[in-house]
């Protein structure tokens, strides 16, 4: 589907794809207890830049908190495209209910304009853009921390480093020819 026309320039993350990636194991406390943590990926659908958040679980509450962190750090998107995960469906529903409860017009205007698009169930290929970015980010994280169990802070730092690596890549072909200026 076509996101925007050629003449319209949007700010980064105005339209984003959201996906959660496979678990990473972290050490908690002084013992040897390991807990699962997940990577939540926000992909800008226009510029292909990424934002990574650490999820403590795949429940709706964890997603909503990560989504609020994303909005606080980046921008409130006008459109979110995601798969049919229960945490995303529940998150969208809870956000709508919470925003409708407030009587303050400012708060309602701030968040109610987000349009949610869900890919059809059981079709991960429909989220091609952000599925490819998940692959890039997972590869970057694996390069940074191969087969190590980290603390949550170390994993969060690894996510920030991976985000930097992925966002630093060229988005178009770079020629090796010095005379080629295009």
Feature names for model-found ranges:
Residues 109-182:
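Charged alpha-helix within mobile-element recombinases
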Residues 1-135, 139:
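Retroviral integrase
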């Amino acid at each position: 589907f076509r996101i925007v026309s050629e003449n319209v320039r949007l700010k980064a993350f105005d339209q984003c794809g959201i996906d959660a990636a496979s678990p990473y194991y972290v050490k908690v406390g002084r013992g040897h207890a390991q807990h699962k943590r997940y990577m939540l990926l926000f992909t800008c659908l226009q510029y292909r830049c990424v934002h990574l958040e650490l999820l403590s679980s795949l429940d709706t509450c964890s997603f909503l908190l990560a989504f609020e962190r994303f909005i606080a750090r980046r921008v409130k998107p006008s459109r979110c495209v995601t798969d049919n995960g229960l945490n995303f469906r529940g998150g969208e529903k809870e956000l709508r209910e919470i925003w409708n409860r407030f009587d303050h017009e400012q708060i309602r205007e701030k968040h109610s304009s987000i349009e949610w698009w869900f890919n059809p169930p059981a079709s991960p290929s429909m989220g091609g853009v952000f599925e490819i970015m998940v692959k890039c980010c997972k590869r970057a994280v694996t390069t940074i921390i191969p087969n190590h169990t980290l603390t949550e802070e170390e994993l969060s730092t690894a996510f920030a480093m991976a985000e930097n690596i992925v966002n630093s890549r060229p988005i178009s072909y770079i020629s090796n020819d010095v005379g080629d200026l295009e």
